[in-house]
Amino acid sequence: MGRGTVWFLRAEAALYAGFLALDLAGTGGGWSLALKYSGIALCLLSALLRAGDREGRLVCAALALTLSADFFLLVLDAWYALGVALFCGVQGLYLARLRAMGAGLWLPLRLGLTAAALLAAVLLGLLTPLNALALVYFPELVCNAAAALSLGRRGRMFGLGLLLFVGCDVCVGLHNLAGLPVPLSAFAQVGMWLFYLPSQVLIVLSIPKE
């Protein structure tokens, strides 16, 4: 492991411990937000320093969109549809990376899951523009995680990162459910970033070494 990677992991660990401590103490606020956003920005910077081939450049582009999406969803706490649309773009770029790695398209599963999710939303009267975007995005993330893990050792780090990404988004969904039991809601509140920053760190580390 190179010196740059060691310092990257140390910095991310410090940011991670900082915002988790603030969130668990219930005193997060602006400081926690700043630490979280800095963690994602540092992931992009590290990816830019590591990128050398097409896979690396695709990850950099995806992390740039991730940072932009988090600006709307985390920093501004507004423009949610735009933020989710940017995350759809992130998954599109990760699909392109998976194809470059030799993974299959998994098109029937992607289309089937998306169609089923949208149909369920229609039947339940829950289909809004924001929900539609989320229901297109989430099946893509799940399929990308499965496709990466199916590649074996070569896709393991990337797949684990995407799997933690799934965990984050499950917590986001739970957090937005009305009437959730207080303990589960409290876990979901912390769990979003408990999973999210490590997912991005693993995705950065999955960039092939030159």
What are these regions, as identified by a protein language model?
Residues 1-210:
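Polytopic alpha-helical membrane-helix bundles and their juxtamembrane interface segments
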